[in-house]
Amino acid sequence: MPWTTTDYDPTDFANRRHIGPSPAEMAEMLEFVGADSLDALIDDTVPASIRQAGALDWAAMSEAELLDHMRAIADKNKPMVSMIGQGYFGTHTPPAIQRNVLENPAWYTAYTPYQPEIAQGRLEALLNFQTMVADLTGLPVANASLLDEATAAAEAMVMAQRASKSKARTFFVDETCHPQTIAVIQTRAEPLGIEVRVGDAAMLDADAVFGAIFQYPCTFGGLRDPSAQIEALHEAKAIAVVATDLLALTVLKEPGAMGADIAVGSAQRFGVPLGYGGPHAAFMSCRDALKRSLPGRIVGVSVDSHGQNAYRLSLQTREQHIRREKATSNVCTAQALLAVMASFYAVFHGPKGLRAIAERVHMRAVRLAASLSAGGFAPDNDTFFDTLTVHVGDKQSRIMAAAVARGINLRDVGADRIGISVDEVTTDAHIEAVCRAFGVLKAPAPKAPAISDDLLRMSDYLTHPIFHMNRAESEMMRYMRRLSDRDLALDRAMIPLGSCTMKLNAAVEMMPITWPEFGNLHPFAPADQAEGYAEMLEDLSAKLCDITGYDAMSMQPNSGAQGEYAGLLTIAAYHRARGETRNICLIPVSAHGTNPASAQMAGMQVVVVKSQEDGDIDLVDFRAKAEAAGDKLAACMITYPSTHGVFEESVREVCEITHELGGQVYLDGANLNAMVGLSKPGELGADVSHLNLHKTFCIPHGGGGPGMGPIGVKAHLAPHLPGHPETGGTQGPVSAAPYGSASILPISYAYVHLMGGSGLTQATKVAILGANYIAKRLEGDYGVLFKGKTGRVAHECILDTRPFAEAGITVDDIAKRLMDHGFHAPTMSWPVAGTLMVEPTESETKAELDRFITAMQAIRAEIAEVEDGLPAGDSPLHHAPHTMEDLVRDWDRAYTREQGCFPPGAFRVDKYWPPVNRVDNVAGDRNLICTCPPLEEYLDAAE
């Protein structure tokens, strides 16, 4: 054939890799929705009054260019042997876990397991995590992770206040807690009116506090049993919290045996890299009596409709999406993927392996202590697990520099002390290098531990067979595969969750997070060892400011909900600096549950604003309530586009009313995927927003975390952004590390560079096209609840399934039936009860959109049969989802097995089979079981 020149560019990442529909498919979709072009659709959808003036104009990179560029940045980081400690330790991620979990889209692209029937694998792994934490801490109930140790400690303080019968308003913090933990607790306490008293635990006045927290082992390495203080607290009807270390608890007396009510800490050293601060899975466990006050997710054991054991998220009525400002916490995204990794680390090593690691760590620390003592540098504590603190007088800077010259970072403790922490990756050569830095000889290996008999662990742990069955890597690999096969993630199908933006997490974006130059850096390493991170943070912040119209960014918040909290604290600090006392926050009734929960955490009083029938904010009600608040108005919180999936034209007026009365505007960035390149929050009148990097900017959801929620602010708020003990600032920190979960920022950095400014804008347009295409295709079968003035939706649409209730069909029935078609359900019953909110994102092809539409139409046909007289109990909808076991078990249904298991349009060859039938939610909450069930259940599942 003759030579011809093609305009196809295989290196165009935005249009050839990230954006799903081809130009031809887009043309078909545009024709169906009645738009002449993509730009015409956008002009018809996005009000001219909110459009940005200039375009995003940086160039795109190819995948090869991006990897070369990021390699150059990574090379500017200098990972040293970290012996800083302070809650962060070197660890070895078993390659079996790195390859099969961290690098596996079956694990990292899943959503939070609200639909338990298609999340059984992930739920089992998280149940293993809870069992691991409960066993090691000696407390019966644990949650499925929190954001980091410091925020877990702050959550424990609030939980203690809620549970305590003491009338005190003071919380005691042991002065030997990690500095970042103390600072985050102080930040959390101030807006809640809690007094924090930091001091020597030996001087604790239990009658004057509602609770206290002790670090065990302490930040300086010492071991002190707080049992006496805990007993005094209990006599005063106060609550005792112990911040602890899971590896240490394999050899040390557990908090439960000391009488602790709550235990918190980080599971980071169970196989999760340092990552310049995160992400890491924190944990919390508690006494059984406190379980209903526990923040975060709790995985429990229930049964399905055939009586088979099944896992689910339990006690959800505690959470923000239901209780709003009365919730136990604003926690939404946590750290599920990292909790899964930590649980597999425990399964991989088993109790004997974990104890062996702990013994090796401890005895190396003992040898180092003996060497330093022989050279005249006796550690402060005679008993310790892995950390020594040594007085060195005026030799501190010389010794620290000598250690750095040998490739080792030690901890600067005040002016005349040095901290040294030993961990899993510490070798004898590292011990010798530290000795040389101190100018002493390495002593012979001692035989006796430096732990007193009364602090040695006497109880067994990890006795469940799951921690003994998978020691061989072949079995471990198969176990991880079996669990991932039970889940439905983006590697199998579109996940059309409204307000969740489940878009492509490209492999090239994920690759750099496993590079040691990003993964092996301690968050408190010297700045000259993290120049690559500094460059990346500066560049990404600048691009996010360009995208949003803000002037400054804080990368510290670890989730969107934490970004909300940080943004509201920033507003509160601004008002205080002006000498104003403002505490009222206006929030629309349709807002995400984290909004009112975050406002309450920031010390604000929530006033709810009505919505109109079309979903827009009721401006009359808004103005009336703003004026009633007067000089007490601190802020309003709005989402744009609205939570109803439309571009409200009144957004500027809302901002103007708020500013006229002295308030600040918080614009929730949950729906930024409909704005990038088209509209800038900072130009609309908003003062602060959080950005969900795990939505709009491609960090994967990880089955419930990690996330990132950096906040952008206008210049007048910049001085009031979160600070940190390690980096300074006028305000307290909201996270343990200065830059939050820094090691996943390369994902978003890669995304904005691969796409370029024009690619990001095109992605927004295609996301809007996809939502309008689905709305138009399904509006004849399901009512589309809210549209803009031109009849368009933004990047998501709400399907009204409420009328089907008259026929006995619930939104839950539709969601479960979608599983038989191989789909995760859209967002259920939010922002309107009994509806489905659909967000397709720009990454899905027309073929996948059509497959979803076909499934929804098939379900509508089944609903019509019920409306025409078929009893609801005889419909496949009522019994969905159907499992492979349904093909062989006794069948007494009014419909055939084929109708139930192979609905019209569903895959037959590559069909996804839910592993359980519909889960009984009531049974799971009535009989809460949140640790691993008996061995027989695992054997049955394996068969």
From Swiss-Prot:
Gene Ontology molecular function: glycine binding; glycine dehydrogenase (decarboxylating) activity; pyridoxal phosphate binding
GO BP, sorted A to Z: glycine decarboxylation via glycine cleavage system
Catalytic activity: N(6)-[(R)-lipoyl]-L-lysyl-[glycine-cleavage complex H protein] + glycine + H(+) = N(6)-[(R)-S(8)-aminomethyldihydrolipoyl]-L-lysyl-[glycine-cleavage complex H protein] + CO2
Highest taxon of source: Bacteria
Requisite cofactors: pyridoxal 5'-phosphate
Alphabetized InterPro entries for the sequence: GcvP (IPR003437), GDC-P_C (IPR049316), GDC-P_N (IPR049315), GDC_P (IPR020581), PyrdxlP-dep_Trfase (IPR015424), PyrdxlP-dep_Trfase_major (IPR015421), PyrdxlP-dep_Trfase_small (IPR015422)
Keywords: Oxidoreductase, Pyridoxal phosphate
Function: The glycine cleavage system catalyzes the degradation of glycine. The P protein binds the alpha-amino group of glycine through its pyridoxal phosphate cofactor; CO(2) is released and the remaining methylamine moiety is then transferred to the lipoamide cofactor of the H protein.
Protein name: Glycine dehydrogenase (decarboxylating)
Organism: Jannaschia sp. (strain CCS1)
Gene name tied to this protein: gcvP
